[in-house]
Amino acid sequence: MKVELKVKPIENGTVIDHIESSKALKVYDLLKINESMPVTLALNVSSKKGSLKDILKIEGLALSKADVNKIALVSPNATINIIKDGKVVSKFKVGIPNKIDGIVKCTNPNCITNKEGIKSKFTVEQKDTLKIRCDYCEKFINSIIISR
């Protein structure tokens, strides 16, 4: 017998769908989610395309542009659904921006952003296999450390 569990829909907030499988906890950790906000987390669920995905539903959360960019860096195929009064009022796919400001930490210990507390700035050189370059020290970064 197949049992299907239903998750109560949210009234007002954000649903992040199509998160790359096993990355929802990383997305959750990056967002500044208030402890009083109800959160539903679904890991490794089947998608209509036959692959596995994660889903994150947060009641009462409005994402900033920086939040959306962080999500794009962790899971570039994620979809954001904005919910108001139980209805989807906006739906869009995240996209990796051409410039990344203040989100990623430069891995060069001698970079001015690490020595003098200047906000980091990166240029995205390649999006398919993410390759970014620090605007200050010109170092290419392939392992991304995202600032909270």
UniProtKB/Swiss-Prot annotation:
Write out the entry's keywords from A to Z. Answer: Metal-binding, Pyrimidine biosynthesis, Zinc
Which GO terms of the molecular function aspect are on file? metal ion binding
Q: How is the cofactor bound?
A: Binds 1 zinc ion per subunit.
Q: Which domain of life is it from?
A: Archaea
Per its UniProt record, the required cofactor names are: Zn(2+)
Name one matching Pfam family. PyrI
Q: Name one GO cellular component term.
A: aspartate carbamoyltransferase complex
Q: Name one GO biological process term.
A: pyrimidine nucleotide biosynthetic process
Q: Which residues bind Zn(2+)?
A: 106, 111, 134, 137
Q: Enumerate the HAMAP family for this protein.
A: Asp_carb_tr_reg
Q: Family assignment?
A: Belongs to the PyrI family.
**How does this protein assemble?**
Contains catalytic and regulatory chains.
Primary role: Involved in allosteric regulation of aspartate carbamoyltransferase.
- The identity of this protein, by name, is Aspartate carbamoyltransferase regulatory chain
- Native source species: Methanococcus vannielii (strain ATCC 35089 / DSM 1224 / JCM 13029 / OCM 148 / SB)
